[in-house]
Design a protein with these regions (language model features):
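Long, compositionally biased intrinsically disordered regions
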Residues: 1, 7-14, 23-26, 205-350
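Generic detector of multi-pass transmembrane helix bundles and their immediately adjacent loops
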Residues: 73, 91-93, 97-100, 105-274
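Core alpha-helical transmembrane segments of integral membrane proteins
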Residues: 15-112, 126, 130-151, 181
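Alpha-helical transmembrane segments and their immediate juxtamembrane interface regions
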Residues: 38-41, 45, 49-52, 65-86, ...
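Extended hydrophobic/aromatic-rich secondary-structure runs
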Residues: 1-20, 71, 115, 175, ...
Length: 350
């Protein structure tokens, strides 16, 4: 009974995520440019998130409260990104994976496999556009604001010791790549929470309850109540994902430290912002520091692990939930390799 119930819940969660995930896959040049713009907007918001995080460091709070307020900072920022219709790249894979899994049901002919490979290229370049849009904006914005603070206030957001620690914590040969993979697990978990929340909302017909509840309509009026019901129906899963992810990014390291686990998180956009702040503090001499280049080299790996781990977990769940089996993986892999040989740029630009 438990296995059957869990499978049904997973199926509904995957179904809701698949509906959302379709919006994150760009297929045309216009959609690609739109994704880059949305990601640039997300990078702008995350730049201020990074600076707010350093401001919290200055308060010297206890581990729990530092984690709580860091999580609150992240959650507010992610919700703001959502409400402004921007995007944070690493949140997309866990939503797009169920949409891709659903398409595996349609495979059979050679044309269908080629069509699926087309979708893979669309997905990969959508992720590339989103990550680059975030990273290429967050770095110069944080760097610029930090330098402005240095020249106007006489001090940057972080001191030299903190800046050196940031670079060391992002070293490619350190545990950062493992922490990035762990962050991918948290990204997947937030998508599960989002799918569950939206499924609960739809199952209990909360939009109808809000729309037709006499007290709510009496307080807000029928038209405004209908708008609120529609707004929550369209945005609830995003709120659930963003708030849960924000607090997990803030609190999980604090709880892990309490139990002596030594786990941390590495989110590529946030890490890029931290690197920018460290660069502003250390000045031009940072270009002569090996630690800077090791940290810079780690960023592509952080992004790849954030994206791939969350996508893999969500894709695996969606395959089980949607009872997709008997897929000829060898033909799919061969088609992907052929596409990489004949049109490698299709994975990066439309």
């Amino acid at each position: 009974l438990f296995a059957s119930n869990s499978s049904l819940v997973a199926a509904k969660v995957a179904e809701r995520s698949a509906e959302t995930g379709e919006h994150y896959i760009t297929r045309t040049a216009a959609e690609y440019r739109s994704m880059v713009k949305k990601a640039a907007g997300g990078g702008l918001v995350i730049a201020f998130t990074t600076l707010a995080k350093f401001a919290l460091y200055a308060l010297a709070l206890s581990a729990f409260w530092a984690g709580f307020w860091a999580g609150f900072n992240y959650a507010v920022s992610f919700v703001l990104v959502q409400l402004l219709h921007f995007t944070v790249a690493t949140k997309q894979p866990a939503m797009t994976a169920p949409a891709m899994a659903a398409k595996l049901k349609e495979l059979g002919t050679g044309d269908a496999i080629e069509s699926f490979v087309d979708e893979i290229t669309h997905l990969v370049r959508s992720q590339v556009a989103a990550v680059l849009g975030n990273v290429l904006v967050v770095y110069p914005v944080v760097l610029g604001i930090a330098l402005l603070m240095l020249h106007t206030l006489g001090q940057p957001p972080i001191n030299t010791k903190q800046a050196e620690h940031v670079l060391e914590s992002l070293h490619l040969l350190g545990p950062s790549v493992l922490f990035a993979a762990f962050t991918g697990v948290l990204l997947f978990a937030s998508s599960i929470i989002a799918g569950w929340a939206e499924n609960w909302f739809v199952l209990h017909r909360m939009d109808s309850a809000l729309h037709y509840n006499p007290r709510i309509t009496g307080l807000l009026g029928a038209e405004r109540a209908a708008r609120w019901a529609r707004f929550l129906r369209e945005n609830l899963s995003g709120f659930a994902a963003n708030i849960s992810l924000g607090f997990m990014l803030g609190l999980v390291p604090a709880f892990a430290a309490f139990f002596g686990l030594g786990l941390d998180v590495r989110h590529v956009t946030l890490s890029t912002g931290q690197m920018a702040a460290a660069s502003a503090t250390l000045g031009l001499q940072v270009l002569q520091m090996p630690a800077f280049w090791w940290a810079m080299a780690s960023l592509p790996f952080l992004g790849a692990l954030n994206v791939s781990v969350s996508f893999y977990l969500a894709f695996s769940l969606a395959l089980r939930a949607q009872n997709v089996s008997g897929v000829d993986r060898a033909r799919i892999y061969a088609a992907i390799r052929a596409r990489l040989r004949t049109a490698p740029l299709s994975f990066f630009v439309p």
